[in-house]
C-alpha cells in the first residue's frame, strides 16, 4: 500500500507540473460593445430613419460612424431603454468621422455606460458631433474616466460638439473622473 501511495503521489505531482506548462484559457473581460455590434434588422442605406432598440445595435451605430458613415440627413430613433452595463463603451464619432445625423432619443434611458479615454482622445456617449441634432434622451448611471496627457475633451453626453443642437437631454446618477498629468495642450471637460 505504501508503494502505491508514493507512486500515486509522484504521478499527481508529475501531472501538476505537466499541466502548469500549458496555458489554460479563462473567461476574458469583454473588450467593449464595439465587438458585439449588430446591424438593425430593418436597416437599409437609403432609409431616412434607422431604429435602434438594443445595446448591440447602438454599438453598430458607433462602429459604423467611426468607420466613416456620418448619417448626415438621417434620423436615428431609439425605441427602447438600453443598458450598456458590463462592457466598455466606444464613443460614437471621431474627429475625422463625426456623427452628423439626428438622434431622437424618444425619452429612452441609456444606463450603465462605462467609457474611458487615455491621453489625446474624445470621451463620452458621443466622441465628436458636428452639425447634428440630439434630443429627448437620458443618460443614467454613467461613469466616465479620462487619463489626460495631451489634447483631451470629455463629457458624459459628448466629448466635442460643434455646430449642433442638443435639447431635452438629462444626465442622472453619473460621474466623471479626470486625471491630468504632464503638460496638456488643451483640455475641456463637461457634462
Regions found by a protein language model. Name each.
Residues 4-18:
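Sec-dependent N-terminal signal peptides
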Residues 27-191:
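Surface-exposed repetitive/solenoidal architectures
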Residues 18-27:
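C-terminal segment of classical bacterial N-terminal signal peptides
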Amino acid at each position: 500500500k505504501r508503494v502505491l501511495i508514493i507512486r500515486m503521489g509522484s504521478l499527481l505531482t508529475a501531472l501538476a507540473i505537466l499541466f502548469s506548462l500549458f496555458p489554460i484559457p479563462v473567461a476574458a473581460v469583454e473588450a467593449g460593445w464595439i465587438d458585439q455590434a449588430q446591424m438593425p434588422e430593418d436597416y437599409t442605406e437609403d432609409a431616412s430613419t434607422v431604429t435602434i432598440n438594443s445595446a448591440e445595435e447602438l454599438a453598430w451605430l458607433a462602429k459604423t460612424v467611426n468607420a466613416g458613415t456620418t448619417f448626415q440627413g438621417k434620423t436615428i430613433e431609439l425605441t427602447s431603454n438600453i443598458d450598456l452595463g458590463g462592457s466598455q463603451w466606444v464613443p460614437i464619432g471621431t474627429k475625422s468621422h463625426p456623427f452628423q445625423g439626428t438622434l431622437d432619443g424618444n425619452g429612452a434611458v441609456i444606463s450603465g455606460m462605462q467609457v474611458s479615454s487615455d491621453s489625446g482622445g474624445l470621451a463620452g456617449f458621443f466622441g465628436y458631433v458636428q452639425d447634428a441634432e440630439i434630443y429627448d434622451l437620458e443618460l443614467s448611471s454613467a461613469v466616465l474616466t479620462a487619463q489626460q496627457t495631451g489634447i483631451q475633451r470629455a463629457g458624459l453626453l459628448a466629448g466635442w460638439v460643434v455646430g449642433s443642437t442638443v435639447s431635452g437631454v438629462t444626465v442622472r446618477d453619473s460621474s466623471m473622473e479626470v486625471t491630468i498629468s504632464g503638460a496638456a495642450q488643451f483640455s475641456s471637460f463637461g457634462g
